[in-house]
């Protein structure tokens, strides 16, 4: 019997060792899974933070470019009154030689002024036949015998824009 008892104890010891090995393996697997999960969570957080940082960089660059493009907007808007005055001076009829020379000088000044405005992105809004509320300001409506409804009849004051932003709409009369 003692031989059987010995065999039984040996089997028990082997089973016990085998169970301990399995338990140890299970513990290692659980720890490895936990570490992998922690790693995946941290990697996901890193990727999200990095993507958010890149989006912030792009947004800041876009805002910087926009600020640069429109930095002179209010200054340019104020200069449009000077431009209007120069254009009005050009439209005055001259009858003597001195007035013609002055008008020529004003025209040269106006041309230079327009070139400088264009250099900084201020451009004339092109005249369009159809009324566009994004570009035009309707001052009044007229009966348009020769014009279709909604068509621009007369430009009363030129409009200007910087890049794609209107700084002064074109003031027009519109056919009913």
From Swiss-Prot:
Query: What InterPro entries does this protein map onto?
Result: GrpE (IPR000740), GrpE_coiled_coil (IPR013805), GrpE_head (IPR009012)
* Pfam families documented for this protein: GrpE
| GO CC field | cytosol
Task: Tell me the domain of life.
Answer: Bacteria
UniProt-annotated location(s):
Cytoplasm
The keyword Transmembrane appears for this protein: no
Q: Which SUPFAM superfamilies match?
A: Coiled-coil domain of nucleotide exchange factor GrpE (SSF58014), Head domain of nucleotide exchange factor GrpE (SSF51064)
Q: Where is this region: Disordered?
A: 1-31
The principal location of this protein is: cytoplasm
Gene3D superfamilies on file: 3.90.20.20, Head domain of nucleotide exchange factor GrpE
Say if the entry is tagged with keyword Chaperone: yes
- Name the UniProt key words of this record, in alphabetical order: Chaperone, Cytoplasm, Stress response
State the disulfide connectivity: none
Q: Name one GO molecular function term.
A: unfolded protein binding
**GO BP annotations, alphabetical order:** protein folding
Q: Its quaternary structure?
A: Homodimer.
Function, as annotated:
Participates actively in the response to hyperosmotic and heat shock by preventing the aggregation of stress-denatured proteins, in association with DnaK and GrpE. It is the nucleotide exchange factor for DnaK and may function as a thermosensor. Unfolded proteins bind initially to DnaJ; upon interaction with the DnaJ-bound protein, DnaK hydrolyzes its bound ATP, resulting in the formation of a stable complex. GrpE releases ADP from DnaK; ATP binding to DnaK triggers the release of the substrate protein, thus completing the reaction cycle.
Q: Which family does it belong to?
A: Belongs to the GrpE family.
Name used for this protein in its record: Protein GrpE
- Organism field: Campylobacter jejuni subsp. doylei (strain ATCC BAA-1458 / RM4099 / 269.97)
């Amino acid at each position: 019997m003692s031989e059987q008892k010995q065999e039984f104890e040996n089997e028990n010891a082997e089973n016990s060792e085998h169970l301990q090995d399995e338990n140890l393996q299970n513990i290692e697997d659980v720890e490895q899974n936990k570490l992998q999960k922690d790693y995946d969570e941290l990697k996901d957080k890193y990727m999200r933070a990095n993507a958010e940082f890149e989006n912030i960089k792009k947004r800041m660059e876009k805002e910087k470019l926009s600020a640069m493009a429109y930095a002179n907007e209010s200054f340019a808007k104020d200069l449009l009154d000077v431009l209007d005055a120069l254009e009005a001076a050009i439209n005055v009829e001259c009858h003597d030689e001195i007035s013609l020379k002055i008008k020529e000088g004003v025209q040269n000044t106006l041309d230079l002024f327009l070139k400088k405005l264009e250099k900084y992105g201020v451009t004339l809004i092109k005249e369009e036949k159809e009324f566009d509320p994004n570009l035009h300001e309707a001052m009044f409506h007229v009966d348009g015998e020769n014009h279709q409804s909604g068509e621009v009849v007369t430009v009363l004051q030129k409009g200007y824009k910087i890049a794609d932003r209107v700084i002064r709409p074109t003031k027009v009369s519109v056919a009913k």
